[in-house]
Amino acid sequence: MMLNKLKKELKENSDSKKAKLSQKYFKTGKGEYGEGQIFLGINTPKKREIAKKYVNLGLENLRKLLESNIHDEKFIALIILEHKYKNSDEKVKKEIFDFYLNNLENINNWDLVDISCYKIIGDYLVDKKRDILYELAISENLWKRRISMISCFAFIRKDDLKDALKISKILIQ
């Protein structure tokens, strides 16, 4: 029920002119990196405002949003997921970390990666083994490689550059 309400609110806030510009900017044409993604033309502040109303959506509903080909739905799902993560105990943070990793195929554009991975993957790994980042760094998938690097921002903020430098070397090879 809440999921349908959210989708309805997104459609009500759509802007076809902005959507067309976003489709071009995010390279959604055939053969481009964002191929097949649909944009509703909602600006980021508005998406964040809408997301705040739906922070109680469960992981199953967030999975449905991430599986959508509507980019704005994915974006909102990640904003909500980051909010849940930030306000959770260690057990729930682990669940959200695992959920994120299990849904990497759907985190498939640079803005989706950049708004979320360092706040979830990076933050979770600050005091843990970071092997998963090295696995992502050697992936064939562009977005997994980007996640491996951007997640390091959480470490860099704590003056820990070691993994960022190692991963950057992997990525430039």
List where the protein language model places each region.
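Alpha-helical scaffold domains
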Residues: 1-173
